[in-house]
């Protein structure tokens, strides 16, 4: 990966859409999570991260990844994350989340900014936004894009991200991550707040949370939602977000991103922590041991596609 000066903390792969066409229950939940320091950015992939998507109508381009960051920075890889190039951005605002669906990338950020690309991330345009609040997470499911952000703001698009409307939110707390699976949208935020929608994002209800810690990201796989956040907190739900339990965590560090692929949940945290679960999110083990220099990286996001996990963090790492 080329050295990049910004905090590239968002990553999406559209290569994995091939598998999500065949296995819609393993499609992704956000894109999106938020970092715990100066940036609201998070990670999402088109089939399994902070946002999840049942992209049955989407076409994939193997090996294409897109990462967004502060100051409107956009980078793109066409070789499975081995090398990256800058892409012209239509905004100078910080970008916090990105997802893919219906052959369209959608990115969200500060001041309600929404951008979209319909040519695999090669070029981007601004979309009309219904809010001036910061948008922190975005996902795709059932042909609907849903974004979440400050003060409980929830927005949705039914026309491939061209225009957006506000949805009624049951909370005024900040929301960071949003995911989709089994015809259910789940969003997570401050003070352990969890909200869910079963009608394509039109209406939302609060769900009971097992934690009071901030929840920064959520993903979906194997009929399981997994949320992560402050102080190493990991929660999971196996009944479409109706109830949640705490999972065993290998770290006390703030967890910034989580994704799902190849029947494995992978999370990333501060101080280079990388951990995974092979038992459907019940417990997680640290896999950082033996990896060179990982303690030097402030890892902020992780994504999966084309049988490849990519993690991104501070300083363009």
Residue positions per predicted region:
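Bacterial Sec-dependent N-terminal signal peptides
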Residues: 10, 15-62
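Residue-level hotspots at or immediately adjacent to binding/recognition sites across diverse folds
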Residues: 40, 53-317
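Bacterial N-terminal signal peptides that target proteins for export
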Residues: 1-8
